[in-house]
Amino acid sequence: MTGETMLCRRVRLVRGNHDAHAGDPPREWRVTCVDEPYAMPPFLACHHATRPPSGYALCGHVHPGIRVATAGESARLPCFVLGRERAILPAFGRFTGLADIAPMRDERIVAVAGLALFELPAMSQNCNA
């Protein structure tokens, strides 16, 4: 068995707000559904953006986005919000939308543009635009 095959053998889905209505995936998909926080030391997989008392939270509910602008052009891009206690992960796809975010002082913004990632300078982080 290759490393790639092994990686695909265990899928964990942290239940979120839409799952109460949609329900768990069919059993034949072999997806294990878990409630938050799901411990994967040193990480906690969380649906909601939280700051845990211990561990590092990987959060997904917010679908953070940022507006970046140049002279005459602007774009809204998905972004990562990275801090000392948590990372808020972007959603990829048009169905989810993007939420304007306001990072905490200890958090950095890394925007996603196609296949490129770029960290925004702290002084240009205007996430409520």
Residue spans of the language-model regions?
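Extended recognition/assembly regions associated with phosphoester-bond processing machinery
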Residues: 1-129
